[in-house]
């Protein structure tokens, strides 16, 4: 599933082609996504794009009359393409722009979303979200406070959007390795110093992944059709049985809440 770096990479890739251009119309080839494509999107016409923003894993396209909320789901990607390029099997939604380009949404598993809202505030998919991990609001003191009474393992807690948004399976595993923290540790057992370190490395890991265009393991592509290259730098995720790049101990894979977790027994305590 695309996580924060992949969504931010998509935002940065599409923004220059959308802001300042006008949506001439939308084409919905298959509206049966995770939720049905909003009827307002079918009727879009002559709408200038004012901004392209991100909240958590949602892309937010600001138009004069409202907002398009896009979620990439499990396998979605957004590409900027020439209008004349014919669609392929899994190209479900596109915005035809005044500059001769199209924003084309591809989603083999159809678990994403294209929604419309007049106002962002109070929309059900955006309520109850924690702070952005790259913001000043997410820091060691905040993390320590939120972990203090939490009697669950730190790995699934990091993936809870009420704590912090956008830290999914890949980056939770990678960040815990970078901080030397075992994923099975109770969240409440982390000291303030450990929380400060963990908050710092989460920011560093996410920023590095954004620099590399995100992580492509299967379906994710950047807006120019290229894969994300952070997969080449993964320290533990997807490396079961391979030697740790630091100490040589074989990487272990377990499951938390049906999600694979990767770690080094020697480096993480």
UniProtKB/Swiss-Prot annotation:
The record lists the catalysed reaction(s) as: Hydrolysis of DNA containing ring-opened 7-methylguanine residues, releasing 2,6-diamino-4-hydroxy-5-(N-methyl)formamidopyrimidine; 2'-deoxyribonucleotide-(2'-deoxyribose 5'-phosphate)-2'-deoxyribonucleotide-DNA = a 3'-end 2'-deoxyribonucleotide-(2,3-dehydro-2,3-deoxyribose 5'-phosphate)-DNA + a 5'-end 5'-phospho-2'-deoxyribonucleoside-DNA + H(+)
UniProt-listed Enzyme Commission number(s): 3.2.2.23, 4.2.99.18
Zn-finger (FPG-type) intervals are 235-269
Query: What Gene Ontology terms for biological process does this UniProt record contain?
Result: base-excision repair
Superkingdom of this entry's organism? Bacteria
For this protein, the record's Pfam families field holds: Fapy_DNA_glyco (PF01149), H2TH (PF06831), zf-FPG_IleRS (PF06827)
> Per its UniProt record, what SMART domains does this chain match?
Fapy_DNA_glyco (SM00898), H2TH (SM01232)
How cofactor binds (record note)? Binds 1 zinc ion per subunit.
Q: Which PROSITE patterns match?
A: FPG_CAT, ZF_FPG_1, ZF_FPG_2
Arranged from A to Z, the UniProt key words for this protein are: DNA damage, DNA repair, DNA-binding, Glycosidase, Hydrolase, Lyase, Metal-binding, Multifunctional enzyme, Zinc, Zinc-finger
Annotated signal sequence range: none
Q: Kindly list the positions annotated as binding DNA.
A: 90, 109, 150
Positions of the catalytic residues: 2-3, 57, 259
User: What is the required cofactor set for this protein?
Assistant: Zn(2+)
Q: Which GO terms describe its molecular function?
A: 8-oxo-7,8-dihydroguanine DNA N-glycosylase activity; class I DNA-(apurinic or apyrimidinic site) endonuclease activity; damaged DNA binding; zinc ion binding
Which family, according to the similarity comment? Belongs to the FPG family.
Quaternary structure annotation from Swiss-Prot or TrEMBL: Monomer.
Query: In UniProt terms, what function does this protein have?
Result: Involved in base excision repair of DNA damaged by oxidation or by mutagenic agents. Acts as a DNA glycosylase that recognizes and removes damaged bases. Has a preference for oxidized purines, such as 7,8-dihydro-8-oxoguanine (8-oxoG). Has AP (apurinic/apyrimidinic) lyase activity and introduces nicks in the DNA strand. Cleaves the DNA backbone by beta-delta elimination to generate a single-strand break at the site of the removed base with both 3'- and 5'-phosphates.
Name of the protein described by the UniProt record: Formamidopyrimidine-DNA glycosylase
Q: Report the source organism.
A: Escherichia coli (strain 55989 / EAEC)
The UniProt gene name for this protein comes to: mutM
């Amino acid at each position: 599933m695309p996580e924060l770096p992949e969504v931010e990479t998509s935002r940065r890739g599409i923004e220059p082609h959308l802001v300042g251009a006008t949506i001439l119309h939308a084409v919905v080839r298959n509206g049966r996504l995770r939720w049905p494509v909003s009827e307002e999107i079918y009727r879009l016409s002559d709408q200038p794009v004012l901004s392209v923003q991100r909240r958590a894993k949602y892309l937010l396209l600001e138009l004069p009359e409202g907002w398009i909320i896009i979620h990439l789901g499990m396998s979605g990607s957004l590409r900027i393409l020439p209008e004349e390029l014919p669609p392929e099997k899994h190209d479900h939604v596109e915005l035809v722009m005044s500059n001769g380009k199209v924003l084309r949404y591809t989603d083999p598993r159809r678990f994403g979303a294209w929604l419309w809202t007049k106002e962002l505030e109070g929309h059900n998919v955006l309520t109850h979200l924690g702070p952005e991990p790259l913001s000043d609001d997410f820091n060691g003191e905040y993390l320590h406070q939120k972990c203090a009474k939490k009697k669950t393992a730190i790995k699934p807690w990091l993936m809870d959007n009420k704590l912090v948004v956008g830290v999914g399976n890949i980056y939770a595993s990678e960040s815990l390795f970078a901080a030397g923290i075992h994923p099975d540790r109770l969240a409440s057992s982390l000291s303030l110093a450990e929380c400060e370190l963990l908050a710092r490395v989460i920011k560093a890991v996410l920023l590095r992944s954004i620099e590399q265009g995100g992580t492509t393991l299967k379906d994710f592509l950047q807006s120019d059709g290229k894969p994300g290259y952070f997969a080449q730098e993964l320290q533990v995720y997807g490396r079961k049985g391979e030697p740790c790049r630091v100490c040589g101990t074989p990487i272990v894979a377990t499951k938390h809440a049906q999600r694979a977790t990767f770690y080094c027994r020697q480096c993480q305590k």
